[in-house]
Design a protein with these regions (language model features):
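A late C-terminal transmembrane helix in Major Facilitator Superfamily
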Residues: 251-290, 298
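Cytoplasmic helix-loop-helix junction between adjacent transmembrane helices
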Residues: 26-62
Length: 319
């Protein structure tokens, strides 16, 4: 399944530069690949490292943050040196390399386990429908709302900064800063999350960073340093919120099968909700011709996300 997902990423990314039709089809393939790999990630952590969920979730988030910061920070600059079509197709080499590494790991793993099979099966089947569990819906809501904030900010931050008088290249660097600033805490935050019984302190911290960050973005017209502060705080808050969401899928379940079930449901619902964010922001900007209303909308989403996160914290397990 992993090979198929990576293959979808490779093909989808490579073909989407040729026409509008290939763009739509390629984007669908990329979305399917990312969705399945995201569901797989917390399940693998829960199965392979049940006593080190925070550490390995941190490694996963760190890798995502590093690759995102490199892409966001240098895409605009590199596209001026080579065409954007070539740049996008060149990125397809990354999942190809990952496929090669996955094949090597699978071959190595088969050799080590050929003489010894696991003493117990993966885990008993989940008998209760995850769609009937309120906590699973709350987890999906938290996942979706934090993703909505992230994708909306990622999509519209450069235009917002340019509307504040910042040039395109600098806006690209600031977007890279937003991704890069979270790297030092990527390892730490999931370990903190997995080591405490209650998540309310972390959820309030994430909420506060979002609110101050969005407020600073409103002030970006008055000073360039407000823009820098906004990118730093929003980088921290989006990374911490994603770490919280991904770690909770493992912490709120007892077995890898439960994790897979909850993660699949939560991320399906969550990303469907998140997909509306950039579109709503674009619609609001077209309606009002300014970014203030968009930022107010994102602040409102932050409040709802905080409330949903506190609901998640009230129950210990989904099943």
């Amino acid at each position: 399944m992993t090979m198929v997902d990576l293959g979808l990423l490779t093909i989808g990314n490579f073909i989407r530069v040729y026409s509008f039709t290939s763009l739509l089809f390629g984007t669908i393939l990329i979305g399917c690949g990312i969705a399945m790999l995201n569901v797989l990630a917390p399940t693998l952590v829960s199965y392979l490292f049940p006593m080190q969920i925070g550490t390995y979730t941190g490694m996963y988030v760190f890798a995502l943050s590093l690759s995102s910061s490199i892409s966001a920070g240098f895409s605009a600059v590199v596209s001026h040196l080579i065409t954007w079509q070539v740049m996008i197709q060149f990125i397809s080499i990354i999942p190809v390399i990952t496929i090669i590494v996955a094949i090597m790991l699978r071959t190595s793993g088969k050799r080590k386990t050929s003489a010894k099979k696991p003493s117990t099966p993966l885990n008993p089947e989940v008998k209760v429908s995850v769609w009937k569990r309120p906590l699973a819906w709350a987890l999906g809501g938290f996942m979706g709302l934090q993703s909505l904030l992230f994708y909306s900010i990622l999509t519209w931050l450069p235009p917002i900064l340019m509307a504040s008088g910042i040039n395109q290249n600098t806006a690209g660097y600031l977007l890279g800063l937003l991704q890069l600033v979270a790297l030092p805490i990527s390892f730490v935050v999931p370990r903190i999350i997995s080591s405490v019984a209650k998540q309310s302190t972390m959820i309030w911290t994430i909420s506060g960073l979002f609110i101050v960050g969005l407020g600073s973005l409103m002030m970006a017209e008055t000073s360039f340093w407000f823009a820098v502060l906004a990118c730093v705080l929003l980088g921290l808050s989006t990374n911490m919120a994603f770490s919280e969401a991904m770690t909770l899928f493992s912490l709120k379940t007892r077995t890898p099968n439960e994790t897979a079930s909850v993660s699949g449901m939560g991320q399906s619902f969550g990303y469907l909700l998140a997909a509306t964010g950039p579109m709503i922001c674009g619609w609001m900007h077209g309606l009002t011709t300014n970014w203030f209303a968009v930022l107010i909308f994102l602040l409102a989403v932050t409040v709802v996300m905080t409330f949903v996160g506190l609901l998640v914290d009230r129950e210990e397990y989904v099943f």
